[in-house]
Amino acid sequence: MDKCPSDQQQTDTNRSIVAHPWRHDPEPTSRPAVTALSEEELALKEHVSAFAKEVIGPKVREMDDKGVMDPEIIAACFEMGIMGIEAPVEYGGVGLGFTAACVVIEEIAKVDPAVAVMVDIHNTLNITAFNRYATTEQKEKYFPRLCKSALSSFCLSESGSGSDAFALKTKAEWDEASQEWVLNGTKSWISNSKEAEIFIIFANTDFSEAHKGITAFIVDKSNPGIAVGAKEDKLGIRASSTCEVTLENCRVSKDAMLGKRGQGYKMAIELLNEGRIGIGAQMVGLALGAFENTLPYLHERKQFGRSVADFQGMQFQYARALMEIEAAKVLVYNAARLKEAKAPFVMEAAMAKLKATEVAQSTASQCIDWLGGIGFTKGMPAEKYYRDSKIGTIYEGTSNIQLVTIAKQIQAGYRV
């Protein structure tokens, strides 16, 4: 019979947990597993899974070879309603939660991580930014487009500001005569930029205030002061466009400011913390896609008169691989649920992205090993998953930045 701790022991246990602010839920709860989906989320998962396989699947190889996102795929994503997951229904959105967005990203990433990151950035960064910081007038103006047809881009990074993202040089100056903001600078490594119609631009309105001068602006593609450069020829997620975005005397009205002046730093930090969960979902989907595309071959392939999947040495490997994928998925959905519950989630988001990225890389690599020589060719999807997985260690905070974030959160719990 299990021994129950005394009241004093229980009190001591609770006290030790509460003492560290990075521990969030010390009390036992009756909630289901964090990966358990609501009826709405489950229906969405099944719907998106079928869409990804039937609509995106046939075009994956061609888009990867050409390094171009098929416009029909972008249009289909809007038609499906998955480009406004968290946008309010009254503006044309779906009105679901953040976890639903993660479900969509994961399911698409199983088929093509490049399409998944397009959907991810549009939803977890840009739709969230408009949800949280846009005025009523801005929501009325932009949400119908963002939900129905206009792809968006999040323009923070610059060539001289990588992990130190807020060392940006793009400036915004107020022109009293015309009553406009004038933006000048160059953004680098901007996802979705080739196809985007709406850009969120981060610029500094006063360099003497350092990061406190950073402000976000909404810029439309039709603005003559914005230009998108050539598409980068990347190792992976090749269909996802990555370009320079140049602002040259780009004039916008005062109504184009997203949020308040000087709020850009806080805005970007918040959005990137949430966006990391979306990247975690992408990496979990990638790992599952590689795994699920490889396992049938292991059962079909015969060596020494037996299915390769029947060899114990192989069983140990794919059993451990799926265990790691499930562990990463739990971290991702735990972070998503915490974010939805408005609980602290910064450390959990960093853990989720880091773990999911590591698992995606290791799973994709193992899948090539399991397939043997054929896995090293473009005849099997494993090599694409392998190439696509690498970006997870780089964008929306490198793996080392995630470790720094986790360490800072832990330290905060022990400071006197």
Regions found by a protein language model. Name each.
Residues 2-121, 133-138, 149, 176-177, ...:
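Alpha-helical interface subdomain recognition
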Residues 81, 105-109, 203, 219-224, ...:
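Short Ser/Thr-interspersed hydrophobic loop/turn segments at strand-loop and sheet-helix junctions
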Residues 119, 160-163, 189-192, 206-208, ...:
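Short Gly/Pro-enriched turn/cap motifs at secondary-structure boundaries
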Residues 127-133, 154, 208:
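Flexible, glycine-rich active-site loops centered on histidine and acidic residues
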Residues 148-157:
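A short, Trp-centered hydrophobic/proline-enriched beta-strand micro-motif
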Residues 167-169, 222-253:
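Flexible, small-/acidic-enriched active-site or ligand-binding loops
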Residues 180-228:
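A short core secondary-structure module
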Residues 249-267:
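Long, acidic (Asp/Glu-rich), low-complexity accessory segments flanking structured domains
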